[in-house]
Amino acid sequence: MKNYILILIVSIITFDSYSQGTTYAKIFSDFNYSLADVSNPYKEFKVSNAIFGHKHTLNNKFSANITFDVGNNSSGSSYTAFLKLASLKWSPTDRVFVDFGIIKASNFTFMENSWGKRYIYKSFQDVNKWSHFSDAGVGLTYILSDNLIIDAQILNGDGYKNLQDSEGHMRGGAGLILKTDGMSFRVARDIVPRTMYGDEYESQYINTFAMIYTASNLSLGGEYNLRENTSNVIDNTSSAFSVYANLDIGNDVSLFGRYDLSDSEDANENQWNIENEGELTIIGIEKQMTKGVKVAVNVKSFKAATLDGEEEAEANNMLYLNLEYKF
């Protein structure tokens, strides 16, 4: 595996030296320290992701992008390289964009870009696997005006780490972004067709409403997600609420916080997915050290969900030092 990664890096650097494109790299690393057991706390240094890629503009209508992501993989070695993006973008006009290949999924891109701290924690849909970061398929973006954008995608549905399933089923979705003074809104709907037929199965739908507010030194954002017929099981509903705030206090320093809450319910009003639900709180401070280098100190607290009448779970608190460096 180490040899493959070395060959990958050398190939990208060599390709860049003979092209007019841009080669880039981004690394996420951290140190985490458990605050739960002061006598014998868990502690760890970790490089969670190393991303390498190359972008090339072919002409004023076509461009290409290839990206590899080296990260942890439960089914592989400690560090496994995946082809994360391999896309061709066609721009027939300055308002229409068509992407083909392994492309970035649009499900959570709006909040991911606004949150802007993927190296600290992914957006809700990403970290909870409601969707994949990227997938093979085709996407269309149409800029109707400076304030209105629509997009649509058809994807394999299995993510960039997997091939298409044997049945050839796909997933699709569409969204709309509305921009006003200092605010942006997105509504979107994603569908995963059922793969089995019967009274207990139905297509899965993810409905998303997201909002962003940006001022001179303050940004706020929030999203509500409702997943109907989760995993194509009829009436298995999942819901999630995620909000964040970021305050710039000067000298390239900002304070930030985030709160996520997830829940579920089936046809009998049971919390069917309770083992994967709860409340997440992140509070921290971030410093832009120089161009391409960010560091953040933060506390992540997760409290697992409990049934009505049960004693509340104890929060699991972790102290993190996160680093992002890109070039």
Regions found by a protein language model. Give the residues of each.
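Outer membrane beta-barrel
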Residues: 21-33, 40-157, 168-172, 176-185, ...
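Sec/Tat signal peptide C-region and signal peptidase I cleavage site
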Residues: 15-19
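Short, contiguous, pocket-lining structural segments
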Residues: 132, 164-171, 175, 199-206, ...
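A short secondary-structure junction signal
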Residues: 151-153, 161-165, 186-188, 197-199
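Outer-membrane beta-barrel pore domains
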Residues: 24, 28-41, 76-78, 86-91, ...
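Short, well-ordered, mixed-charge alpha-helical segments that flank or form enzyme active sites
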Residues: 107-110, 158-163, 194-196
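Sec-dependent N-terminal signal peptides
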Residues: 4-13
